[in-house]
């Protein structure tokens, strides 16, 4: 028998907690015998004294086990269960292509996604731009759609990692969000509760990333790989660039439109293709669906080009309540804004930098994201046809096309975009993918 305050005292004094102590504390969080004040104090001691890898593994497992851990064995999927998680960015629509691509190669992807957070877009908000798409199906429907389509993307249920929900809510109001140990446990407890056999983590770097520096992003990636593998789930991380909008679009309906066009081959943004392929290839290799990344990439291009990936996406949408002909007739279903017109730079020159975070916040300001949890999303607004770093902005090449509800909203968005995109000055290219971090690298 332990006392929460003694566990807090021990960590406050810089000592290492045992797995039993961490389990006891997190069970108390889940059953409400640990108070909000004690959660806040516990988080702050970790913030200042950090945790060893063994402590992080124990914390992640305790939070994972605080609620339901999905067991897919009764579904007899007949293939490996794989997933990916991204730390989030702007125009990061990879999940919508990646899930169907991996499914078409023989993987099963039961993906539990989130809503938009701050400047980053949420996969669930994008999918809800599709009429009828149900992000909260029963576990039976979740499993059946995953089996039939190879992929199902839904929202988190209250049964998964409930301790994380309490801890996160307290961290959010006590300045303890940005800590590697706590971020690692929060991300992984939810993902590992989904019954995965392997996971690929996409950690963003740059002006639109969650972590402030390359070094911090790399440290988080290493922590996630070490802890997830320590908890028994094969995991790899990739560090990818978020110094500019990833896709050609940012918003909800505009990104879904781009995802479908990507899957059907109508248009594939080269940066988006590279980052999506990098994540998918790691997933196939980890799941033993490909021998190496070259083999994986060949298989992935094949399912893109022969229509199998697009078919998996269509099957998922229909299985979760969306239109059966969505892939064929997406433009009939996705909401459109009243005003769709380009915005040009005030001067001619090379685009040398983007404040990607500011672009994400511009989408939020238009109503394409939430300031508070109760805000309604406007699915139609956003940007598309983004200029890329290194390209020349002039009277022929706009910065982007704005999808707005009114002239006034268009003007506001144009002003935000012009101040977020730097024209002129030195441009230093950055790679789409900086590096992979595998278990053997740690």
From Swiss-Prot:
GO cellular component: a single term: cytosol
Pathway, per record: Pyrimidine metabolism; dTMP biosynthesis via salvage pathway; dTMP from thymine: step 1/2
EC number: 2.4.2.4
Any Pfam family matching the protein: Glycos_trans_3N
A molecular-function term among this protein's GO annotations: 1,4-alpha-oligoglucan phosphorylase activity
Keywords assigned: Glycosyltransferase, Transferase
Chemical reaction(s) catalysed: thymidine + phosphate = 2-deoxy-alpha-D-ribose 1-phosphate + thymine
Enzyme class per UniProt: transferase
Keyword set includes Membrane: no
Lineage: superkingdom: Bacteria
Gene Ontology biological-process entries: pyrimidine nucleobase metabolic process; thymidine metabolic process
PROSITE patterns according to UniProt: THYMID_PHOSPHORYLASE (PS00647)
Assembly notes: Homodimer.
Record family assignment: Belongs to the thymidine/pyrimidine-nucleoside phosphorylase family.
Described function: The enzymes which catalyze the reversible phosphorolysis of pyrimidine nucleosides are involved in the degradation of these compounds and in their utilization as carbon and energy sources, or in the rescue of pyrimidine bases for nucleotide synthesis.
Protein name: Thymidine phosphorylase
Gene: deoA
């Amino acid at each position: 028998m332990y006392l929460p305050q003694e566990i807090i005292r021990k960590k406050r004094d810089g000592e290492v907690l045992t797995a039993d102590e961490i389990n006891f504390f997190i069970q108390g969080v889940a059953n409400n015998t640990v108070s909000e004040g004690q959660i806040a104090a516990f988080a702050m001691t970790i913030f200042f004294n950090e945790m060893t890898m063994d402590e992080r593994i124990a914390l992640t497992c305790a939070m994972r086990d605080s609620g339901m851990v999905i067991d897919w064995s009764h579904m007899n999927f007949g293939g490996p269960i794989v997933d990916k998680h991204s730390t989030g960015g702007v125009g990061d629509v990879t999940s919508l292509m990646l899930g169907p691509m991996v499914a078409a190669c023989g993987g099963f992807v039961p993906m539990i996604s989130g809503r938009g957070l701050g400047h980053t877009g949420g996969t669930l908000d994008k999918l809800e731009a599709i009429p009828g798409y149900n992000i909260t199906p029963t576990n039976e429907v979740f499993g059946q759609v995953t089996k039939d389509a190879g992929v199902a993307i839904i929202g988190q249920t209250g049964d998964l990692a409930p301790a994380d929900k309490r801890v996160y809510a307290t961290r959010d109001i006590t300045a303890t969000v940005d800590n590697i140990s706590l971020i690692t446990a929060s991300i992984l407890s939810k993902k590992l509760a989904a019954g995965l056999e392997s996971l690929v983590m996409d950690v963003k770097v740059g002006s639109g990333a969650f972590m402030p520096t390359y070094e911090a992003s790399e440290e988080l990636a290493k922590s996630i790989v070490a802890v997830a593998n320590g908890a028994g789930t094969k995991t790899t991380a990739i560090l990818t660039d978020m110094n500019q909008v990833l896709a050609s679009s940012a918003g909800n309906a505009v990104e879904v439109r781009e995802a479908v066009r990507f899957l059907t081959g109508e248009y594939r943004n080269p940066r988006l293709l590279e980052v999506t392929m990098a994540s998918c290839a790691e997933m196939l290799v980890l799941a033993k669906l490909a021998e190496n990344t070259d083999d994986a990439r060949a298989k992935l291009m094949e399912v893109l080009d022969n229509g199998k990936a697009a078919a998996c996406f269509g099957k998922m949408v229909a299985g979760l309540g969306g239109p059966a002909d969505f892939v064929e007739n997406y433009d009939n279903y996705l909401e459109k804004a009243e005003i769709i017109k380009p915005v040009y730079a005030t001067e001619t020159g090379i685009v040398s930098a983007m404040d990607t975070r500011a672009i994400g916040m511009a989408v939020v300001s238009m109503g394409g994201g939430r300031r508070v949890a109760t805000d309604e999303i406007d699915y139609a607004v956003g940007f598309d046809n983004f200029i890329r770093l290194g390209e020349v902005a002039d009277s022929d090449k706009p910065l982007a096309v704005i999808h707005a509800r009114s002239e006034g909203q268009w003007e506001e968005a144009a002003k935000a975009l012009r101040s977020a995109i730097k024209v002129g000055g030195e441009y230093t290219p950055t790679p789409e993918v900086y590096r992979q971090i595998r278990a053997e690298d740690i």
